[in-house]
């Protein structure tokens, strides 16, 4: 059994110092992320996962706009809903209890915790869980994962929920 700190360290990707970078806004680049988390350049899907992961590593949200941000430039892109989709999950046993780990469409693992909570938002007229990430980003829980969670969810007077690190996250 591992400690929560060890699990967080294992899952953590190197964080960019976006707060320290103050580049000029250099305009818009024709990159769009559709509602399924697919990345497009000029209308053509970017199929190389390494390229998408590179772009994702410099992606941030400021106010209501998404940007690819580096120390020297900041380019706006279009995001239809959110840039990432939760496509898989697992529980990890820690000294602090079971931790819910979510895997996004880029095969990156994220720990559901107070720092990265599941929040309910509207998507296509339905209340859906989203995982809140750093730098204003979020990942929508896929329908498949949602139904898997529904099968194991607990309930109380507020509704159905799933637990991570002894905290309840409501599914609807």
Predicted regions and their residues:
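Long, non-globular segments of proteins
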Residues: 1-172
């Amino acid at each position: 059994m591992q400690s929560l700190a060890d699990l967080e360290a294992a899952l953590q990707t190197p964080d960019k110092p976006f707060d320290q970078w103050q580049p000029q806004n250099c305009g818009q680049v024709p990159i769009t992320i559709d509602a399924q988390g697919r990345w497009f350049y000029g209308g053509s899907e970017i199929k190389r996962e390494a390229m998408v992961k590179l772009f994702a590593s410099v992606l941030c949200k400021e106010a209501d706009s998404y940007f690819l941000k580096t120390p020297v430039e900041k380019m706006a892109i279009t995001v239809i809903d959110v840039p990432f989709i939760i496509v898989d999950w697992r529980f990890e046993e820690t000294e602090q209890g079971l931790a819910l780990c979510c895997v996004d469409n880029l095969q990156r693992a994220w720990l559901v915790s107070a720092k990265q909570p599941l929040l309910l938002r509207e998507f296509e007229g339905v209340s859906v869980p989203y995982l809140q990430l750093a730098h204003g980003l979020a990942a929508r829980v896929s329908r498949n994962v949602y139904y898997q969670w529904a099968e194991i969810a607990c309930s109380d007077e507020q509704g159905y929920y799933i637990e991570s690190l002894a905290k309840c996250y409501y599914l609807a």
